[in-house]
């Protein structure tokens, strides 16, 4: 089960004090703490592929 609700709500709490918005970590030291992508986007190793963009973190907004 994916603990991240980002794909449904746009935000999630990834455990402890770590919170994410739009699959980007906002309150911990990691660049990303959710292995999820926005609705309609594909997941890949380094981020999300949205709107035909290449696979990198800038795709997941």
Swiss-Prot record:
Binding locations of a divalent metal cation 4: 33-34, 44, 48
Sites where the protein binds a divalent metal cation 2: 6, 12, 14, 25
GO biological process: protein complex oligomerization; response to cadmium ion; response to copper ion; response to mercury ion; response to zinc ion
Gene3D superfamilies according to UniProt: Metallothionein Isoform II (4.10.10.10)
InterPro entries: Metalthion_dom_sf (IPR017854), Metalthion_dom_sf_vert (IPR023587), Metalthion_vert (IPR000006), Metalthion_vert_metal_BS (IPR018064)
Positions contributing to a divalent metal cation 6 binding: 37, 41, 44, 60
Chain sites annotated for binding a divalent metal cation 3: 14, 18, 23, 28
Assigned keywords, A-Z: Metal-binding, Metal-thiolate cluster
Region of interest: Beta: 1-28
Region entry Alpha, spans: 29-61
Free-text function comment from the UniProt entry: Metallothioneins have a high content of cysteine residues that bind various heavy metals.
UniProt similarity note: Belongs to the metallothionein superfamily. Type 1 family.
Official protein name in the record: Metallothionein A
């Amino acid at each position: 089960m994916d603990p991240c609700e980002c794909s449904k709500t746009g935000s999630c709490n990834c455990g402890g004090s770590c919170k994410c918005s739009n699959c980007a970590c906002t309150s911990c030291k990691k660049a990303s703490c959710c292995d999820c992508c926005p609705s309609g986007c594909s997941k890949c190793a380094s981020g999300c592929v949205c709107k035909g963009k290449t696979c990198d973190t800038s795709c997941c907004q």
